[in-house]
From Swiss-Prot:
The keyword Nucleotide-binding does not apply. Inhibited by monoubiquitin and diubiquitin. Deubiquitinating enzyme (DUB) that controls levels of cellular ubiquitin through processing of ubiquitin precursors and ubiquitinated proteins. Thiol protease that recognizes and hydrolyzes a peptide bond at the C-terminal glycine of either ubiquitin or NEDD8. Has a 10-fold preference for Arg and Lys at position P3'', and exhibits a preference towards 'Lys-48'-linked ubiquitin chains. Deubiquitinates ENAC in apical compartments, thereby regulating apical membrane recycling. The lineage of its organism: Eukaryota, Metazoa, Chordata, Craniata, Vertebrata. Residues 152-159 are annotated as: Interaction with ubiquitin. Crossover loop which restricts access of large ubiquitin adducts to the active site. Its EC number is 3.4.19.12. InterPro entries: Papain-like_cys_pep_sf, Peptidase_C12_UCH, Peptidase_C12_UCH_sf, UCH_AS. SUPFAM superfamilies: Cysteine proteinases (SSF54001). It catalyses: Thiol-dependent hydrolysis of ester, thioester, amide, peptide and isopeptide bonds formed by the C-terminal Gly of ubiquitin (a 76-residue protein attached to proteins as an intracellular targeting signal). The gene is UCHL3. This is Ubiquitin carboxyl-terminal hydrolase isozyme L3. Highly expressed in heart, skeletal muscle, and testis.
């Protein structure tokens, strides 16, 4: 993924909510922390939830799994509804912004946008593009890039230098047409994780998150945030 490189975003609801506000999203939906994966802690997350973002480490084990998963889907096929908004990632460290775009784009009907919203404009202009075209469009979309850069400096930890290699990655988990989709711009296509509903999205998404953790039991660097009705 040579070429453009952005500063990474934190998996921090304050940062993501401020970022989306600056892009013209009305705060009727807000990101909140998911403090744990067990039912008691999940019950603390305000409902309804329309998306979950997972931050996880890219490890050797994960990369082996990713390659195997891709080959399996290419040989066996999978059902993916044409309603899914999916884009590729061509900008290093832009996975946080792409995760947010995936979360909002696939819940656009639930969202309220301020007049002149940059994000609404981007989504409307890219709606009929291919995943690759959307990636290239983002590369040249200065209004989002500048807002991302500002937000990357607003986290609780100091932003790394632009050249520092970052091995943490964001994906979005969303409900589209009755199915749970994993949207990861590093992958060639969305991953269909089976049936879900608006009511069970959080629990179903967390089951997928648990599989990421089980694949790397020695890793602690996992963080999930949920997009909840405010």
């Amino acid at each position: 993924m040579e070429g453009q490189r952005w500063l990474p975003l934190e998996a921090n609801p304050e940062v993501t909510n401020q970022f989306l506000k600056q892009l013209g999203l009305h705060p009727n939906w807000q990101f909140v922390d998911v403090y744990g994966m067990d039912p008691e802690l999940l019950s603390m997350v305000p409902r309804p939830v329309c998306a979950v973002l997972l931050l996880f480490p890219i490890t050797e084990k994960y990369e082996v799994f990713r390659t195997e998963e891709e080959e399996k889907i290419k040989s066996q096929g999978q059902d993916v509804t044409s309603s899914v908004y999916f884009m590729k990632q061509t900008i290093s460290n832009a996975c946080g912004t792409i995760g947010l775009i995936h979360a909002i784009a696939n819940n656009k009907d639930k969202m309220h946008f301020e007049s002149g919203s940059t994000l609404k404009k981007f989504l409307e202009e890219s709606v009929s593009m291919s995943p690759e075209e959307r990636a290239r469009y983002l590369e040249n979309y200065d209004a989002i890039r500048v807002t991302h850069e500002t937000s990357a400096h607003e986290g609780q930890t100091e932003a790394p230098s632009i050249d520092e290699k970052v091995d943490l990655h964001f994906i979005a988990l969303v409900h589209v047409d009755g199915h749970l989709y994993e949207l990861d711009g590093r992958k060639p296509f969305p991953i269909n994780h089976g049936e879900t509903s608006d009511e069970t999205l959080l629990e179903d998404a967390i089951e997928v998150c648990k599989k990421f953790m089980e694949r790397d039991p020695d890793e602690l660097r996992f963080n999930a945030i949920a997009l909840s009705a405010a």
